[in-house]
Amino acid sequence: MNKTVELVKQWGIFEEKHPDGSIEDFCRYLLIHQRESESKLPLAGGVIPMIPAGLLLKLIGRINRLNMNYAYSALEGTGLNQLEEFGMLLYVQQEKNPRKTDVIHAHLLELSSGTDMLNRLKSRGFIAEQTDREDKRSKRLQLTASGEQAIEKGIQRVKKMATMMTHHMAEEDMLLCIKLLKGIDQKFSALFSSHKGKSFDEAYGEVMESTVSNF
């Protein structure tokens, strides 16, 4: 096949899958697709899912679990015990004076477990709590000086951990992964709260129906 025709064909395939993708994304896609087709690295972790979607989610889940486990040791000496605590402090720092429930929902936590985690951070002196002036039923959070210090210590450790976990990847590969996966994160982060209390079949039906209606 003529190389120009083949290139146009590959662009059509890419554009259909990633309509917002740039030419730079397409070039990364071609290079990685070629490289991965030649890769013979075995997969870790036992049973291999039967469909690509299952394998992708399994890999994401395993990497996340490994990341969480390394975080326990990486955060030693910072006053923080897990990545969720570090993430919550960062959220409070960035949002300045967020509502307690907003912090919990932003981290996709159940209200009870999220409240417990925030209470532990409060008891360690990392955050302070005050009543919302506009809604007396709500609480707002503020970072303390100790919380700022914990973030300063933690951010260096988390950066080192992220570098360690991805040191074998080229930056363009990471950027492409972000480009390809952020749509899933955005979509289901928006849907997650509305799916609480519904059966899986109901959630599945809503997602698939909206997908079909967009074509």
Task: Walk through the language-model features, giving the residues of each.
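N-terminal leader segment of winged-helix/HTH proteins
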Residues: 1-78
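Charged, amphipathic alpha-helical coiled-coil/dimerization segments
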Residues: 2, 120-175
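A generic alpha-helix surface/boundary motif
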Residues: 69, 86, 159-160
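Long, hydrophobic, amphipathic alpha-helical segments used as structural scaffolds
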Residues: 71-75, 79, 107, 169, ...
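Generic structural concept
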Residues: 60, 64, 92-93, 144, ...
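Terminal interaction helix/tail motif
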Residues: 158-215
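N-terminal helix-turn-helix DNA-binding core of bacterial DNA-binding proteins
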Residues: 72-109, 113
